Amino acid sequence: MEQKIKFPRSQKVYLPGKLYPNIRVAMRKVEQVPSVSFEGEEKIATPNPEVYVYDTSGPFSDPSMSIDLKKGLPRLREEWIVGRGDVEQLPEITSEYGQMRRDDKSLDHLRFEHIALPYRAKKGEAITQMAYAKRGIITPEMEYVAIRENMNCEELGIETHITPEFVRKEIAEGHAVLPANINHPEAEPMIIGRNFLVKINTNIGNSATTSSIDEEVEKALWSCKWGGDTLMDLSTGENIHETREWIIRNCPVPVGTVPIYQALEKVNGVVEDLNWEIYRDTLIEQCEQGVDYFTIHAGIRRHNVHLADKRLCGIVSRGGSIMSKWCLVHDQESFLYEHFDDICDILAQYDVAVSLGDGLRPGSIHDANDEAQFAELDTMGELVLRAWEKNVQAFIEGPGHVPMHKIKENMERQIEKCHDAPFYTLGPLVTDIAPGYDHITSAIGAAQIGWLGTAMLCYVTPKEHLALPDKEDVRVGVITYKIAAHAADLAKGHPGAQVRDNALSKARYEFRWKDQFDLSLDPERAQGYFRAGHHIDGEYCTMCGPNFCAMRLSRDLKKNAKSDK
Protein backbone atom coordinates (compact mmCIF):
# COMPACT_ATOMS: atom_id res chain seq x y z
CA MET A 1 0.00 0.00 0.00
CA GLU A 2 2.74 2.47 -0.91
CA GLN A 3 1.43 5.90 -1.91
CA LYS A 4 2.97 8.73 -3.91
CA ILE A 5 1.74 12.20 -4.85
CA LYS A 6 3.32 13.84 -7.89
CA PHE A 7 3.15 17.31 -9.40
CA PRO A 8 4.59 18.23 -12.81
CA ARG A 9 8.04 19.85 -12.76
CA SER A 10 7.86 20.30 -9.01
CA GLN A 11 10.42 19.53 -6.38
CA LYS A 12 9.85 18.90 -2.68
CA VAL A 13 12.09 21.28 -0.75
CA TYR A 14 12.73 21.94 2.94
CA LEU A 15 13.76 25.22 4.52
CA PRO A 16 15.67 25.03 7.84
CA GLY A 17 14.79 26.90 10.99
CA LYS A 18 16.99 29.53 12.62
CA LEU A 19 15.88 29.22 16.23
CA TYR A 20 15.63 25.46 15.72
CA PRO A 21 18.10 24.59 12.93
CA ASN A 22 17.02 20.95 12.87
CA ILE A 23 13.45 21.64 11.76
CA ARG A 24 12.77 21.16 8.06
CA VAL A 25 9.78 23.12 6.74
CA ALA A 26 8.24 21.42 3.73
CA MET A 27 7.08 23.26 0.62
CA ARG A 28 6.97 22.77 -3.14
CA LYS A 29 9.19 24.46 -5.71
CA VAL A 30 7.84 24.79 -9.27
CA GLU A 31 10.37 25.10 -12.07
CA GLN A 32 9.76 27.35 -15.08
CA VAL A 33 11.17 27.29 -18.61
CA PRO A 34 13.10 30.35 -19.87
CA SER A 35 11.36 33.26 -21.60
CA VAL A 36 12.33 33.47 -25.28
CA SER A 37 12.79 36.73 -27.19
CA PHE A 38 14.56 37.78 -30.38
CA GLU A 39 17.08 40.48 -31.14
CA GLY A 40 16.92 40.48 -34.91
CA GLU A 41 17.55 36.88 -35.83
CA GLU A 42 19.20 36.07 -32.51
CA LYS A 43 17.15 33.96 -30.09
CA ILE A 44 17.62 35.00 -26.45
CA ALA A 45 16.58 32.78 -23.52
CA THR A 46 16.04 34.53 -20.18
CA PRO A 47 15.68 32.26 -17.12
CA ASN A 48 12.53 32.53 -15.02
CA PRO A 49 12.75 32.01 -11.25
CA GLU A 50 11.40 28.98 -9.45
CA VAL A 51 8.13 29.61 -7.63
CA TYR A 52 7.63 28.31 -4.07
CA VAL A 53 4.09 27.23 -3.17
CA TYR A 54 2.46 26.15 0.10
CA ASP A 55 2.27 22.36 0.19
CA THR A 56 -0.11 20.17 2.22
CA SER A 57 0.84 16.83 0.67
CA GLY A 58 3.29 15.86 3.41
CA PRO A 59 5.83 13.08 2.83
CA PHE A 60 3.64 11.61 0.08
CA SER A 61 5.22 14.01 -2.44
CA ASP A 62 8.80 13.44 -1.30
CA PRO A 63 10.44 11.02 -3.78
CA SER A 64 13.11 10.14 -1.22
CA MET A 65 10.53 8.71 1.20
CA SER A 66 8.62 5.46 0.94
CA ILE A 67 5.22 5.65 2.66
CA ASP A 68 3.31 2.49 3.53
CA LEU A 69 -0.25 3.23 4.65
CA LYS A 70 -0.20 0.13 6.85
CA LYS A 71 2.63 1.66 8.89
CA GLY A 72 1.62 5.33 8.74
CA LEU A 73 3.65 8.50 8.33
CA PRO A 74 6.92 9.40 10.10
CA ARG A 75 6.30 10.87 13.56
CA LEU A 76 7.71 14.30 12.69
CA ARG A 77 6.99 16.11 15.98
CA GLU A 78 7.51 13.31 18.51
CA GLU A 79 11.08 14.36 19.31
CA TRP A 80 9.96 17.95 19.96
CA ILE A 81 7.06 16.82 22.15
CA VAL A 82 9.06 14.40 24.28
CA GLY A 83 12.06 16.73 24.43
CA ARG A 84 10.08 19.34 26.35
CA GLY A 85 9.92 16.94 29.29
CA ASP A 86 6.33 17.74 30.28
CA VAL A 87 4.45 14.73 28.86
CA GLU A 88 4.36 11.06 29.79
CA GLN A 89 3.60 8.01 27.69
CA LEU A 90 0.72 6.04 29.17
CA PRO A 91 1.06 2.28 29.75
CA GLU A 92 -2.19 1.75 27.83
CA ILE A 93 -5.15 3.62 26.40
CA THR A 94 -7.53 4.78 29.13
CA SER A 95 -10.82 5.17 27.27
CA GLU A 96 -13.24 2.35 28.13
CA TYR A 97 -14.60 2.27 24.60
CA GLY A 98 -11.09 2.31 23.13
CA GLN A 99 -10.15 -0.66 25.32
CA MET A 100 -13.29 -2.52 24.25
CA ARG A 101 -12.48 -2.02 20.55
CA ARG A 102 -8.86 -3.02 21.15
CA ASP A 103 -9.91 -6.28 22.81
CA ASP A 104 -12.50 -7.22 20.17
CA LYS A 105 -10.76 -9.89 18.06
CA SER A 106 -13.46 -9.70 15.37
CA LEU A 107 -12.03 -6.29 14.41
CA ASP A 108 -8.49 -7.52 13.80
CA HIS A 109 -8.92 -7.48 10.01
CA LEU A 110 -9.90 -3.78 10.14
CA ARG A 111 -7.39 -2.59 12.67
CA PHE A 112 -4.40 -0.31 12.02
CA GLU A 113 -1.58 -2.48 13.33
CA HIS A 114 1.15 -0.03 14.31
CA ILE A 115 -0.52 1.93 17.12
CA ALA A 116 1.78 3.76 19.53
CA LEU A 117 0.85 4.22 23.17
CA PRO A 118 -0.67 7.66 23.79
CA TYR A 119 0.97 10.65 25.48
CA ARG A 120 -0.63 12.91 28.08
CA ALA A 121 0.55 15.92 30.07
CA LYS A 122 2.34 15.15 33.30
CA LYS A 123 0.40 16.17 36.38
CA GLY A 124 0.52 19.93 36.88
CA GLU A 125 2.09 20.64 33.47
CA ALA A 126 0.56 23.03 30.91
CA ILE A 127 1.52 21.64 27.50
CA THR A 128 -0.65 23.49 24.99
CA GLN A 129 0.82 25.80 22.37
CA MET A 130 -1.21 28.58 24.04
CA ALA A 131 0.35 27.83 27.43
CA TYR A 132 3.85 27.97 25.97
CA ALA A 133 3.02 31.17 24.10
CA LYS A 134 1.72 32.86 27.24
CA ARG A 135 4.98 31.99 28.98
CA GLY A 136 6.95 33.64 26.18
CA ILE A 137 8.21 30.36 24.71
CA ILE A 138 8.59 30.05 20.93
CA THR A 139 8.21 26.35 20.16
CA PRO A 140 9.55 24.54 17.09
CA GLU A 141 5.94 24.39 15.88
CA MET A 142 5.71 28.19 16.01
CA GLU A 143 8.91 28.72 14.03
CA TYR A 144 7.76 26.06 11.56
CA VAL A 145 4.52 27.89 10.77
CA ALA A 146 6.28 31.27 10.50
CA ILE A 147 8.59 29.87 7.82
CA ARG A 148 5.72 28.03 6.14
CA GLU A 149 3.52 31.13 5.93
CA ASN A 150 6.32 33.20 4.38
CA MET A 151 7.71 30.52 2.07
CA ASN A 152 10.67 32.21 0.33
CA CYS A 153 9.68 35.86 0.92
CA GLU A 154 13.10 36.58 2.44
CA GLU A 155 14.88 35.34 -0.69
CA LEU A 156 12.59 37.47 -2.87
CA GLY A 157 13.10 40.58 -0.73
CA ILE A 158 9.41 40.73 0.24
CA GLU A 159 8.73 42.34 3.62
CA THR A 160 6.72 40.27 6.06
CA HIS A 161 5.27 40.78 9.51
CA ILE A 162 5.11 37.03 10.17
CA THR A 163 7.99 36.14 12.47
CA PRO A 164 8.18 33.37 15.09
CA GLU A 165 7.59 36.04 17.74
CA PHE A 166 4.51 37.31 15.90
CA VAL A 167 3.17 33.74 15.75
CA ARG A 168 3.76 33.32 19.50
CA LYS A 169 1.99 36.59 20.30
CA GLU A 170 -1.05 35.75 18.14
CA ILE A 171 -1.43 32.36 19.82
CA ALA A 172 -0.96 33.82 23.32
CA GLU A 173 -3.70 36.38 22.68
CA GLY A 174 -6.07 33.77 21.24
CA HIS A 175 -6.08 35.38 17.79
CA ALA A 176 -4.62 32.27 16.15
CA VAL A 177 -4.76 28.52 16.68
CA LEU A 178 -1.98 26.00 16.03
CA PRO A 179 -3.86 22.67 16.21
CA ALA A 180 -1.33 20.03 17.26
CA ASN A 181 -2.45 17.14 19.47
CA ILE A 182 0.61 15.52 21.05
CA ASN A 183 -0.78 12.18 19.81
CA HIS A 184 -0.76 13.28 16.17
CA PRO A 185 2.99 13.86 15.73
CA GLU A 186 2.68 12.98 12.04
CA ALA A 187 1.00 16.33 11.32
CA GLU A 188 3.05 19.21 9.90
CA PRO A 189 2.41 22.37 11.97
CA MET A 190 0.04 24.95 10.47
CA ILE A 191 -1.77 27.99 11.83
CA ILE A 192 -5.32 29.36 11.66
CA GLY A 193 -5.82 33.09 12.20
CA ARG A 194 -6.95 36.14 10.26
CA ASN A 195 -3.43 37.59 10.11
CA PHE A 196 -2.21 34.50 8.26
CA LEU A 197 -3.04 32.72 5.02
CA VAL A 198 -6.71 31.79 4.79
CA LYS A 199 -6.98 28.03 5.32
CA ILE A 200 -9.52 25.53 4.04
CA ASN A 201 -10.98 22.45 5.69
CA THR A 202 -12.18 19.31 3.93
CA ASN A 203 -15.00 17.19 5.33
CA ILE A 204 -14.90 13.45 4.71
CA GLY A 205 -16.38 10.46 6.53
CA ASN A 206 -18.53 7.41 6.01
CA SER A 207 -22.27 7.18 6.56
CA ALA A 208 -24.57 4.37 7.59
CA THR A 209 -25.12 3.50 3.92
CA THR A 210 -21.95 4.51 2.08
CA SER A 211 -18.15 4.19 1.98
CA SER A 212 -15.37 2.09 3.53
CA ILE A 213 -12.12 2.67 5.45
CA ASP A 214 -10.07 2.45 2.25
CA GLU A 215 -12.28 5.00 0.51
CA GLU A 216 -12.06 7.48 3.38
CA VAL A 217 -8.26 7.19 3.62
CA GLU A 218 -8.09 7.71 -0.14
CA LYS A 219 -10.25 10.84 0.17
CA ALA A 220 -8.00 12.14 2.96
CA LEU A 221 -4.88 11.78 0.81
CA TRP A 222 -6.73 13.28 -2.15
CA SER A 223 -7.63 16.33 -0.07
CA CYS A 224 -4.00 16.74 1.02
CA LYS A 225 -2.83 16.53 -2.60
CA TRP A 226 -5.07 19.34 -3.80
CA GLY A 227 -4.45 21.66 -0.85
CA GLY A 228 -6.77 20.90 2.07
CA ASP A 229 -5.20 22.47 5.17
CA THR A 230 -7.18 20.49 7.72
CA LEU A 231 -9.45 17.47 7.53
CA MET A 232 -12.61 16.66 9.44
CA ASP A 233 -13.69 13.04 9.79
CA LEU A 234 -17.47 13.22 10.12
CA SER A 235 -18.06 9.47 9.98
CA THR A 236 -21.46 8.33 11.22
CA GLY A 237 -21.43 4.75 9.90
CA GLU A 238 -19.72 1.57 11.02
CA ASN A 239 -16.25 1.24 12.53
CA ILE A 240 -15.81 4.94 13.29
CA HIS A 241 -12.96 4.26 15.73
CA GLU A 242 -10.94 2.16 13.27
CA THR A 243 -11.60 4.50 10.33
CA ARG A 244 -10.34 7.46 12.35
CA GLU A 245 -7.16 5.62 13.39
CA TRP A 246 -6.26 4.86 9.76
CA ILE A 247 -6.89 8.46 8.74
CA ILE A 248 -4.90 10.07 11.57
CA ARG A 249 -1.87 7.80 11.19
CA ASN A 250 -1.66 8.69 7.49
CA CYS A 251 -2.62 12.36 7.62
CA PRO A 252 0.00 15.15 7.41
CA VAL A 253 -2.57 17.85 8.27
CA PRO A 254 -4.58 18.42 11.48
CA VAL A 255 -7.67 16.25 11.88
CA GLY A 256 -10.93 17.38 13.47
CA THR A 257 -14.08 15.53 14.50
CA VAL A 258 -17.53 16.13 15.99
CA PRO A 259 -17.47 13.82 19.05
CA ILE A 260 -21.23 13.96 19.58
CA TYR A 261 -21.67 11.89 16.39
CA GLN A 262 -19.77 8.93 17.81
CA ALA A 263 -21.31 9.39 21.24
CA LEU A 264 -24.74 9.09 19.60
CA GLU A 265 -23.66 5.90 17.82
CA LYS A 266 -22.69 4.46 21.22
CA VAL A 267 -26.31 4.83 22.40
CA ASN A 268 -27.68 3.40 19.14
CA GLY A 269 -28.89 6.76 17.89
CA VAL A 270 -31.21 7.41 20.85
CA VAL A 271 -30.61 11.09 21.70
CA GLU A 272 -32.34 10.81 25.08
CA ASP A 273 -29.73 8.27 26.22
CA LEU A 274 -26.77 10.59 25.69
CA ASN A 275 -25.03 11.74 28.86
CA TRP A 276 -21.84 13.36 30.09
CA GLU A 277 -20.11 10.08 30.99
CA ILE A 278 -20.46 8.68 27.45
CA TYR A 279 -19.37 11.97 25.92
CA ARG A 280 -16.40 12.28 28.28
CA ASP A 281 -15.13 8.80 27.38
CA THR A 282 -15.53 9.67 23.68
CA LEU A 283 -13.38 12.78 24.15
CA ILE A 284 -10.63 10.80 25.86
CA GLU A 285 -10.81 8.06 23.22
CA GLN A 286 -10.33 10.57 20.42
CA CYS A 287 -7.70 12.64 22.28
CA GLU A 288 -5.63 9.49 22.71
CA GLN A 289 -5.99 8.65 19.03
CA GLY A 290 -4.67 12.07 18.02
CA VAL A 291 -7.61 14.24 16.96
CA ASP A 292 -6.34 17.83 16.78
CA TYR A 293 -9.60 19.75 17.24
CA PHE A 294 -13.17 19.02 18.26
CA THR A 295 -16.33 20.71 17.10
CA ILE A 296 -18.35 21.05 20.29
CA HIS A 297 -21.85 22.53 20.20
CA ALA A 298 -21.73 23.97 23.71
CA GLY A 299 -23.34 27.22 22.56
CA ILE A 300 -26.75 25.55 22.41
CA ARG A 301 -28.61 26.60 25.57
CA ARG A 302 -31.94 25.33 26.86
CA HIS A 303 -33.44 28.83 26.74
CA ASN A 304 -32.19 29.49 23.16
CA VAL A 305 -33.55 26.42 21.39
CA HIS A 306 -37.03 27.88 20.86
CA LEU A 307 -35.59 30.84 18.93
CA ALA A 308 -35.21 28.59 15.87
CA ASP A 309 -38.97 27.97 15.79
CA LYS A 310 -39.49 31.16 13.78
CA ARG A 311 -37.21 29.99 10.98
CA LEU A 312 -38.01 28.79 7.51
CA CYS A 313 -35.57 25.86 7.85
CA GLY A 314 -35.27 25.40 11.61
CA ILE A 315 -32.05 23.82 12.90
CA VAL A 316 -29.84 22.40 10.13
CA SER A 317 -26.72 21.48 12.11
CA ARG A 318 -26.59 17.78 12.97
CA GLY A 319 -24.82 18.48 16.27
CA GLY A 320 -27.14 21.40 16.95
CA SER A 321 -30.27 19.34 16.36
CA ILE A 322 -28.96 16.51 18.58
CA MET A 323 -28.24 18.83 21.51
CA SER A 324 -31.44 20.82 21.02
CA LYS A 325 -33.50 17.65 21.18
CA TRP A 326 -31.59 16.50 24.29
CA CYS A 327 -32.29 19.81 26.05
CA LEU A 328 -35.99 19.68 25.22
CA VAL A 329 -36.49 16.00 26.08
CA HIS A 330 -34.78 16.37 29.46
CA ASP A 331 -35.85 19.99 30.00
CA GLN A 332 -32.30 20.66 31.17
CA GLU A 333 -29.33 22.81 30.30
CA SER A 334 -27.01 21.16 27.76
CA PHE A 335 -24.44 18.87 29.38
CA LEU A 336 -21.87 20.29 26.95
CA TYR A 337 -22.41 23.77 28.37
CA GLU A 338 -22.63 22.56 31.97
CA HIS A 339 -19.40 20.54 31.66
CA PHE A 340 -17.49 22.93 29.41
CA ASP A 341 -14.77 23.51 32.02
CA ASP A 342 -14.38 19.74 32.41
CA ILE A 343 -14.12 19.43 28.63
CA CYS A 344 -11.34 22.02 28.57
CA ASP A 345 -9.48 20.22 31.36
CA ILE A 346 -9.44 17.07 29.22
CA LEU A 347 -8.41 18.86 26.02
CA ALA A 348 -5.59 20.71 27.76
CA GLN A 349 -3.90 17.42 28.67
CA TYR A 350 -3.38 16.59 24.99
CA ASP A 351 -3.32 20.06 23.38
CA VAL A 352 -6.56 19.56 21.49
CA ALA A 353 -8.21 22.76 20.25
CA VAL A 354 -11.93 23.43 20.54
CA SER A 355 -13.95 24.58 17.57
CA LEU A 356 -17.13 26.03 19.04
CA GLY A 357 -19.82 24.61 16.79
CA ASP A 358 -22.58 26.78 15.39
CA GLY A 359 -25.52 24.53 16.12
CA LEU A 360 -27.96 27.34 15.31
CA ARG A 361 -26.37 28.45 12.04
CA PRO A 362 -28.87 29.53 9.37
CA GLY A 363 -29.78 26.88 6.80
CA SER A 364 -31.32 29.31 4.35
CA ILE A 365 -30.69 32.92 3.42
CA HIS A 366 -34.16 33.66 4.84
CA ASP A 367 -32.85 32.73 8.31
CA ALA A 368 -29.50 34.56 8.10
CA ASN A 369 -28.43 36.85 10.96
CA ASP A 370 -31.47 36.04 13.05
CA GLU A 371 -31.94 36.07 16.81
CA ALA A 372 -31.14 32.37 17.23
CA GLN A 373 -27.84 32.60 15.36
CA PHE A 374 -26.62 35.62 17.28
CA ALA A 375 -27.81 34.35 20.68
CA GLU A 376 -25.57 31.33 20.20
CA LEU A 377 -22.69 33.58 19.09
CA ASP A 378 -22.99 35.51 22.36
CA THR A 379 -22.63 32.25 24.31
CA MET A 380 -19.60 31.32 22.21
CA GLY A 381 -17.99 34.58 23.28
CA GLU A 382 -18.36 33.51 26.91
CA LEU A 383 -17.06 29.99 26.19
CA VAL A 384 -13.96 31.13 24.34
CA LEU A 385 -12.84 33.08 27.42
CA ARG A 386 -13.38 29.99 29.57
CA ALA A 387 -11.29 27.93 27.14
CA TRP A 388 -8.46 30.48 27.20
CA GLU A 389 -8.44 30.42 31.01
CA LYS A 390 -7.59 26.72 30.72
CA ASN A 391 -4.95 27.43 28.01
CA VAL A 392 -7.09 25.64 25.43
CA GLN A 393 -6.88 27.04 21.92
CA ALA A 394 -10.29 27.94 20.50
CA PHE A 395 -11.94 29.06 17.32
CA ILE A 396 -15.51 29.88 16.36
CA GLU A 397 -17.65 28.22 13.70
CA GLY A 398 -19.93 30.36 11.57
CA PRO A 399 -22.59 30.14 8.87
CA GLY A 400 -23.96 28.81 6.69
CA HIS A 401 -26.41 30.52 4.30
CA VAL A 402 -25.98 34.32 4.21
CA PRO A 403 -26.74 36.74 1.34
CA MET A 404 -23.83 38.97 0.39
CA HIS A 405 -25.17 42.15 1.97
CA LYS A 406 -25.37 40.42 5.38
CA ILE A 407 -21.89 38.85 5.40
CA LYS A 408 -20.03 41.85 6.81
CA GLU A 409 -22.24 41.97 9.91
CA ASN A 410 -21.31 38.34 10.66
CA MET A 411 -17.60 39.09 10.63
CA GLU A 412 -17.83 42.32 12.63
CA ARG A 413 -20.10 40.80 15.25
CA GLN A 414 -17.91 37.70 15.61
CA ILE A 415 -14.77 39.79 16.18
CA GLU A 416 -16.57 41.90 18.79
CA LYS A 417 -18.44 39.17 20.68
CA CYS A 418 -15.79 36.44 20.44
CA HIS A 419 -12.74 38.58 21.25
CA ASP A 420 -11.06 38.14 17.86
CA ALA A 421 -10.77 34.36 18.16
CA PRO A 422 -10.35 32.83 14.67
CA PHE A 423 -13.57 32.48 12.65
CA TYR A 424 -14.25 29.29 10.66
CA THR A 425 -17.20 29.38 8.25
CA LEU A 426 -19.07 26.97 5.99
CA GLY A 427 -19.10 29.17 2.90
CA PRO A 428 -21.40 30.99 3.40
CA LEU A 429 -23.76 30.15 0.55
CA VAL A 430 -25.11 33.39 -0.90
CA THR A 431 -28.18 31.91 -2.61
CA ASP A 432 -30.30 28.78 -2.19
CA ILE A 433 -31.35 28.12 -5.80
CA ALA A 434 -28.41 26.07 -7.10
CA PRO A 435 -28.35 22.45 -5.85
CA GLY A 436 -25.52 20.73 -7.70
CA TYR A 437 -23.58 23.99 -7.83
CA ASP A 438 -23.34 24.88 -4.16
CA HIS A 439 -19.54 24.75 -4.32
CA ILE A 440 -19.93 27.92 -6.41
CA THR A 441 -22.69 29.61 -4.41
CA SER A 442 -20.64 29.08 -1.26
CA ALA A 443 -17.25 30.05 -2.74
CA ILE A 444 -18.68 33.48 -3.58
CA GLY A 445 -19.47 34.04 0.09
CA ALA A 446 -16.27 32.34 1.24
CA ALA A 447 -14.04 34.69 -0.76
CA GLN A 448 -15.87 37.70 0.63
CA ILE A 449 -15.87 36.62 4.28
CA GLY A 450 -12.23 35.47 3.96
CA TRP A 451 -11.29 38.95 2.78
CA LEU A 452 -13.15 40.44 5.74
CA GLY A 453 -11.22 38.30 8.22
CA THR A 454 -12.40 34.70 8.41
CA ALA A 455 -9.40 32.49 9.17
CA MET A 456 -10.59 29.15 7.78
CA LEU A 457 -13.20 28.15 5.22
CA CYS A 458 -14.96 24.80 5.31
CA TYR A 459 -15.24 23.54 1.76
CA VAL A 460 -18.51 22.70 0.05
CA THR A 461 -18.74 20.16 -2.77
CA PRO A 462 -21.15 20.01 -5.73
CA LYS A 463 -23.06 17.31 -3.84
CA GLU A 464 -23.86 19.53 -0.82
CA HIS A 465 -27.50 18.92 0.23
CA LEU A 466 -27.68 16.00 -2.23
CA ALA A 467 -25.33 13.10 -1.44
CA LEU A 468 -22.10 11.94 0.23
CA PRO A 469 -19.18 13.34 -1.81
CA ASP A 470 -16.88 10.95 -3.65
CA LYS A 471 -13.23 11.39 -4.54
CA GLU A 472 -13.88 13.65 -7.54
CA ASP A 473 -16.24 15.82 -5.50
CA VAL A 474 -13.49 16.26 -2.90
CA ARG A 475 -11.13 17.48 -5.64
CA VAL A 476 -13.65 19.97 -7.01
CA GLY A 477 -14.53 21.23 -3.53
CA VAL A 478 -10.91 21.69 -2.47
CA ILE A 479 -9.86 23.48 -5.67
CA THR A 480 -12.93 25.73 -5.55
CA TYR A 481 -12.11 26.74 -1.98
CA LYS A 482 -8.40 27.18 -2.69
CA ILE A 483 -9.50 29.76 -5.25
CA ALA A 484 -11.70 31.52 -2.68
CA ALA A 485 -8.98 31.45 0.00
CA HIS A 486 -6.29 32.71 -2.37
CA ALA A 487 -8.55 35.50 -3.62
CA ALA A 488 -8.98 36.56 0.01
CA ASP A 489 -5.20 36.40 0.62
CA LEU A 490 -4.64 38.71 -2.35
CA ALA A 491 -7.26 41.15 -1.10
CA LYS A 492 -5.74 41.09 2.42
CA GLY A 493 -2.25 41.72 1.04
CA HIS A 494 -0.66 38.63 2.57
CA PRO A 495 3.13 38.76 2.06
CA GLY A 496 4.07 37.06 -1.20
CA ALA A 497 0.50 36.07 -2.09
CA GLN A 498 0.75 37.58 -5.57
CA VAL A 499 4.04 35.94 -6.59
CA ARG A 500 2.34 32.90 -8.12
CA ASP A 501 -0.27 35.02 -9.93
CA ASN A 502 2.41 37.21 -11.48
CA ALA A 503 4.44 34.21 -12.58
CA LEU A 504 1.44 32.56 -14.21
CA SER A 505 0.33 35.80 -15.89
CA LYS A 506 3.81 36.28 -17.35
CA ALA A 507 3.78 32.69 -18.61
CA ARG A 508 0.37 33.28 -20.20
CA TYR A 509 1.54 36.45 -21.92
CA GLU A 510 4.59 34.65 -23.28
CA PHE A 511 2.60 31.56 -24.34
CA ARG A 512 4.61 29.30 -22.05
CA TRP A 513 1.79 26.79 -21.85
CA LYS A 514 3.57 24.23 -19.68
CA ASP A 515 4.37 26.86 -17.05
CA GLN A 516 0.73 27.97 -17.03
CA PHE A 517 -0.35 24.41 -16.29
CA ASP A 518 2.34 23.74 -13.69
CA LEU A 519 1.70 26.96 -11.75
CA SER A 520 -2.06 26.42 -11.62
CA LEU A 521 -4.01 24.95 -8.71
CA ASP A 522 -5.00 21.96 -10.84
CA PRO A 523 -2.34 21.31 -13.52
CA GLU A 524 -4.02 18.10 -14.68
CA ARG A 525 -7.36 19.78 -15.36
CA ALA A 526 -5.81 22.79 -17.11
CA GLN A 527 -3.67 20.65 -19.38
CA GLY A 528 -6.58 18.29 -20.07
CA TYR A 529 -8.78 21.12 -21.34
CA PHE A 530 -5.92 22.48 -23.45
CA ARG A 531 -5.20 19.12 -25.07
CA ALA A 532 -8.90 18.46 -25.66
CA GLY A 533 -8.94 21.62 -27.81
CA HIS A 534 -6.45 19.94 -30.21
CA HIS A 535 -3.91 22.68 -29.71
CA ILE A 536 -0.38 22.72 -30.81
CA ASP A 537 1.92 24.57 -28.43
CA GLY A 538 1.60 27.77 -30.43
CA GLU A 539 0.99 31.43 -29.68
CA TYR A 540 -2.79 31.22 -29.45
CA CYS A 541 -5.54 28.92 -28.24
CA THR A 542 -8.79 27.80 -29.87
CA MET A 543 -10.75 30.42 -27.91
CA CYS A 544 -9.50 33.22 -30.18
CA GLY A 545 -7.46 31.57 -32.92
CA PRO A 546 -4.34 33.09 -34.51
CA ASN A 547 -5.89 36.35 -35.74
CA PHE A 548 -7.90 37.41 -32.69
CA CYS A 549 -5.51 36.61 -29.84
CA ALA A 550 -5.26 39.87 -27.87
CA MET A 551 -2.01 38.89 -26.15
CA ARG A 552 -0.40 37.96 -29.45
CA LEU A 553 -1.46 41.29 -30.97
CA SER A 554 -0.22 43.13 -27.86
CA ARG A 555 3.17 41.46 -28.14
CA ASP A 556 3.37 42.45 -31.81
CA LEU A 557 2.63 46.05 -30.85
CA LYS A 558 5.48 45.96 -28.33
CA LYS A 559 7.85 44.54 -30.94
CA ASN A 560 6.89 47.25 -33.43
CA ALA A 561 7.32 49.98 -30.83
CA LYS A 562 10.76 48.62 -30.03
CA SER A 563 11.70 48.58 -33.73
CA ASP A 564 10.54 52.19 -34.22
CA LYS A 565 12.91 53.30 -31.48
Swiss-Prot record:
Claim: Iron is one of the keywords in the record: yes
**Superkingdom of origin:** Bacteria
Provide the GO biological process annotations: thiamine biosynthetic process; thiamine diphosphate biosynthetic process
Q: Under the cellular component aspect of Gene Ontology, which terms does the record hold?
A: cytosol
- Which controlled-vocabulary keywords does the entry list? 4Fe-4S, Iron, Iron-sulfur, Lyase, Metal-binding, S-adenosyl-L-methionine, Thiamine biosynthesis, Zinc
Q: Which reaction does it catalyse?
A: 5-amino-1-(5-phospho-beta-D-ribosyl)imidazole + S-adenosyl-L-methionine = 4-amino-2-methyl-5-(phosphooxymethyl)pyrimidine + CO + 5'-deoxyadenosine + formate + L-methionine + 3 H(+)
- Which residues does the record give as Zn(2+) binding sites? 401, 465
Residues annotated as binding substrate: 203, 232, 261, 297, 317-319, 358-361, 397, 424
Keyword S-adenosyl-L-methionine included in the entry's annotation: yes
User: Which cofactors are named for this entry?
Assistant: [4Fe-4S] cluster
Pfam families listed in its UniProt record? ThiC-associated (PF13667), ThiC_Rad_SAM (PF01964)
Q: What does this protein's record comment on cofactor binding?
A: Binds 1 [4Fe-4S] cluster per subunit. The cluster is coordinated with 3 cysteines and an exchangeable S-adenosyl-L-methionine.
Q: Report the HAMAP family cross-referenced here.
A: ThiC
Q: What is the name listed in the Swiss-Prot or TrEMBL entry for this protein? A: Phosphomethylpyrimidine synthase
Give the species this sequence originates from: Bacteroides thetaiotaomicron (strain ATCC 29148 / DSM 2079 / JCM 5827 / CCUG 10774 / NCTC 10582 / VPI-5482 / E50)
